[in-house]
From Swiss-Prot:
Renumbered residue ranges of the record's region Disordered: 158-180, 302-332
Knockout mutant characteristics: No visible phenotype under normal growth conditions, but mutant plants mutant exhibit reduced sensitivity to high salinity during seed germination and seedling development.
Stretches that traverse the bilayer: 421-441
Name of the protein: NAC domain-containing protein 69
Membrane topology (UniProt): Single-pass membrane protein
Induction and repression of expression: By salt stress and abscisic acid (ABA) in roots.
Naturally occurring in which organism (per UniProt): Arabidopsis thaliana
Plastid recorded as keyword: no
Polar residues biased stretches: 162-180, 312-332
DNA-binding region, residue range(s): 107-159
GO (cellular component) term, any one: plasma membrane
Pfam families, alphabetized: NAM
Single GO biological process annotation from the record: positive regulation of DNA-templated transcription
UniProt keyword list: Activator, DNA-binding, Membrane, Nucleus, Stress response, Transcription, Transcription regulation, Transmembrane, Transmembrane helix
Length: 457
């Protein structure tokens, strides 16, 4: 029979529950639905007893029931949700069920409820969940039944099974989305010792240390004769990749490769296997042994000029700790490096005409040496100006810091003294002012009669 097939389950969709089962139940066509879903009053039972009341016996933690609508009172259309030991609490938003095969309109809604043990508001949550399907495509007076889909979301061993014990329990759990199923894990297959895998290697080969295995060169691996997989040929090394004899293109290309060229490319194995060194030293604190201040001699040639023009550019670098100032370092360089500059100028005779006299060269060299001295003076004047500007900026920063500290102290005082203290002080001062004014008025009134009495006399 079909019901005895492995994986066969009664799990209709929301559209099928409303369009077929609930509609036929309300319209009186019970012979079409009574075989699958039983009718009970779901609030008369605790959820733990519901699996045994299901019409279809299944090991899945999902059961279906027809339930007549029951209200708390005749006047109030409030659905009854309480049981003998707990209550069903609605949660989430109602979902619309649409007819995907017919007019694609709304045919019903689905409510989600969770069962709590105890009474409101001290109920204890349980893993029992119920989806309540209501039909909306029929008139209001005919909507007297709902379909309750009861599910258990806890552990499988905690809920009594509604199926027969002869069948082997299924490990599949059906989720709310009706799509995800978790199956019991199967045993993983591992390779046995001595059995070769897809790459021609066995577990024994993997366990052998590298230094104990035979040493093969790159050409031995790329040799076309080694690439054919022949199970009857014991000379094929298990570490070589196996190819079928039909791969003529690849093998033909390998036969045209010169072996000497391949071995030459990989001859220096130490250089290939040597790890590269990364320069991670910090060069910020590096100081040279000599001062990096001097003259770079440049030359340029022009076809219209009769003599070679030599230009020198001075540059300033990091001085050694023994140098006192920029001027001293440049002076030392000019004294000690004059001969080197002359020798370098003698060598620069490639672009100009060879008829340049020694006096012309010396005058050009003198101009190139005097120019750095003037630049050094300009640098010193700029340094003095920068020092004065730095002093001004530091004084401005100090004044700003002082003003900031004063502002912070005032803010701290305001923070320590709340606003109502200032109000109290103002009121007290105003009262004292009124008292002082009243005293002055009384004194003046006392003085007026005395003055009148003196006048009468």
């Amino acid at each position: 029979m079909v019901k005895d097939l492995v994986g066969y389950r009664f799990y209709p969709t929301g559209e099928e529950l409303i369009n077929h089962y609930l509609k036929n139940k309300i319209l009186g066509k019970t012979w079409l639905v009574d075989e699958a879903i039983s009718e009970i009053n779901i609030c008369s039972y605790d959820p733990i007893y519901l699996p045994s009341l299901s019409k279809i016996k299944s090991d899945d933690p999902v059961w279906y029931f027809f339930c007549p609508k029951e209200y708390t009172s005749a006047k109030k259309k409030v659905t009854k949700r309480t049981t003998s030991s707990g209550y069903w609490k609605a949660t989430g938003v109602d979902r619309k069920i649409k007819d995907k095969r017919g007019n694609r309109g709304e045919i019903g809604i689905k409510k989600t409820l969770v069962y709590y043990e105890g009474r409101v508001p001290k109920g204890v949550w349980t893993p029992w969940v119920m989806h309540e399907y209501h039909i909306t495509c029929l008139p209001q007076d005919q909507r007297n039944y709902v379909i309750c889909q009861v599910m258990y979301k806890g552990e499988d061993g905690d809920v009594p099974s509604g199926g027969n014990n002869s069948s082997e329990p299924s490990q599949s759990l059906v989720s709310d989305s009706n799509t995800v199923r978790a199956t019991s894990p199967t045993a993983l297959e591992f390779e046995k010792p001595g059995q070769e895998n897809f790459f021609g290697m066995s577990v024994d080969d993997l366990g052998t240390p590298k230094n104990e295995q035979e040493d093969f060169s790159l050409w031995d691996v790329l040799d076309p004769d080694m690439l054919f997989s022949d199970n009857n040929n014991p000379t094929v090394h298990p570490q070589a990749p196996h190819l079928t004899p039909n791969d003529d293109e690849f093998l033909g290309g390998l036969r045209h490769v010169n072996r000497e060229q391949v071995e030459y490319l990989f001859a220096n194995e130490d250089f290939i296997s040597r790890p590269t060194l990364s320069m991670t030293e910090n060069r910020n604190d590096h100081r040279p042994k000599k001062a990096l201040s001097g003259i770079i001699v440049d030359y340029s040639s022009d076809s219209n000029s009769d003599a070679e023009s030599i230009s020198a550019t001075s540059y300033q670098g990091t001085s050694s700790p023994g140098d006192d100032s920029v001027g001293s370092s440049n002076r030392q360089f000019l004294q000690t490096g004059g001969d080197e500059i002359l020798s370098s100028c003698n060598d620069l005779q490639t672009y100009g005409e060879p008829s340049i006299s020694s006096s012309t060269r010396q005058s050009q060299l003198t101009r190139s040496i005097i120019r750095p001295k003037q630049e050094v003076k300009q640098d010193t004047s700029r340094a003095v100006d920068s020092d004065t500007s730095i002093d001004k900026e530091s004084s401005m920063v100090k004044t700003e810091k002082k003003s900031w500290f004063i502002t912070e102290e005032a803010m701290e005082r305001n923070r320590n003294n709340p606003r109502y203290i200032y109000l109290m002080r103002m009121i007290i001062g105003f009262i004292l002012l009124l008292a002082l004014i009243s005293n002055i008025i009384s004194v003046l009134q006392n003085l007026n009669p005395a003055m009148k009495f003196d006048r009468e006399r």
